[in-house]
Amino acid sequence: PRGGVCSIGGVLIFGELDEERAAAVEARLRSIAEAAAERGRDSFGVVVLSRSGLYRWYKDRRPAPEALRDMPRLIDEGSAAAIFNNRAEPTTEHVSEKTPDDIQPMLGERIAVTHNGTIANDLELERRYGLRRRSRIDTAVLPPLLEKIWDGSLEGLRRILRDEVVGSFALAVLDSARPGRLWLAANFRPLYYMWDRQLNALFFASSDAYLQGDVAPWDGNYVGRLEPYTVVEIGVDRTWRSASLWRADSEPGRRRRALVVASGGLDSTTAAAALLRQGYEVALLHFNYRHVAEDPERRAVREISKALGIPLIEVDMDFFKLAGRSPLLGEGEINRVDMGREGAEFAHEWVPARNFVFIALAVALAEAWGYDYVALGVNMEEAGAYPDNEMELVRLLNRALPYATGPQRRVQLLMPVGHLVKHEIVRLGLEAGAPLHLTWSCYDKGPKHCGRCGPCYMRRLAFKINGVRDPVEYDLPPEAEEEFWRGTRPYVWRPPRPEPKGSA
């Protein structure tokens, strides 16, 4: 049987305990365990480790709120740590007659483990290392495995969890030989921790909501997330050491393959050229989503691909026909008030969740085809009007992506121009050798840039601020164009070259 979906939690207690603090720690631990029953109601167990290295355990087939009512005192003045587990037993793995050994946390001779997830290769580990476990539940293989091959170090635990164990996990480990230590680890299962200043104790659980509700900052405690694919060692001497569980080929910076979501415009083209200059292997990903400017954008991105000598992947999609309701999709008029100024300052041409949809599809392709990064042309200028250009969206999505891709399939989002406004993007594009003369920015279908929509307005000003005449043509009176560009120098394209190694 598999471990299934559970909630785990516990506490590591710092300093000497008196009766009052022990009671308060227990009250907090019980409230966390009861809240965590949301993620598991088929059994409940708790293991308490004393400062002298002795275990006490209490296990019950009932859910935590019922089981805890009948359990004796858990935390006393000699307690060092405790771990618990609320198990949600999958329908296909129902065990009608559970023994205490079938209820987590799992105990060995020295090691106690509470685990949320599935160990897919438990039988293989059992055979390979000649292990004897006390239950057929997959998690039961972990205590004997650690007792047999773990040297007790953080690095040793990292190696076992990264290279030996196959499956999903958020787990906590106690060792009776070292009662002042706690190890927490997670790949793509959630795990949060909270430092309780008043109680001088570190609590942890499968959700931040179980640790602390909504409180004013001055009334609350620090709550953090254990980052996916991380293992930490925590000591009552205030040791906090962490190590990555990403395999070597998934470590950041080891491989540099980037898939750039490319519209054919200034921002994504500059992003691609900047990455090329930094030594990335780059490919362009373009979506033909039945928008008004589809034809000129498609022509532009194809020419950009040729000019930069990089692959282009095109995806044809009809999805946004269902969403509709945007001038970019042919419904309504493109805003050209005040030569595009108004369109540059407000999202009149918003396409529902467009960037979010593109990001999801790009991440799927990146995972499938071995790209480490998806790069976007989001930028600070357009974030003022379009929420999906905000850097915070990318930052938050990066935190969520380990839960969206397969095990050890790391894909991260990059925003090479995310911190720049439009004239800074043009300057970077000129420096990085982006073929800006091939780009298409206009919301309309041409054949020339209209010169009166929001993107045209920003583009023209951005080039002028840099003292360079925009190389694309605008559908504006020639005399007005000559007057606007007077005093600027001609645009010159210099293809990108990789930066020398060691340069900033």
Predicted regions and their residues:
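Short, charged low-complexity linear segments at domain edges
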Residues: 417-443, 481-482, 487-488
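ATP-dependent adenylation/nucleotidyltransferase module used to activate substrates
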Residues: 254-432
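Conserved short alpha-helical segments that host acidic/polar catalytic motifs at enzyme active sites
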Residues: 1-253
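Local cysteine-cluster metal-coordination motifs and their immediate loop/turn environment
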Residues: 7-8, 43, 356, 360, ...
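Long, charge-rich boundary regions
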Residues: 476-504
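Predominant activation on well-ordered alpha-helical scaffold segments within soluble catalytic domains
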Residues: 30, 140-143, 205, 302, ...
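Iron-sulfur (Fe-S) cluster-binding segments and ferredoxin-like electron-carrier domains
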Residues: 448, 454-476, 481
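Conserved residues at the C-terminal ends of beta-strands
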Residues: 12, 377, 459
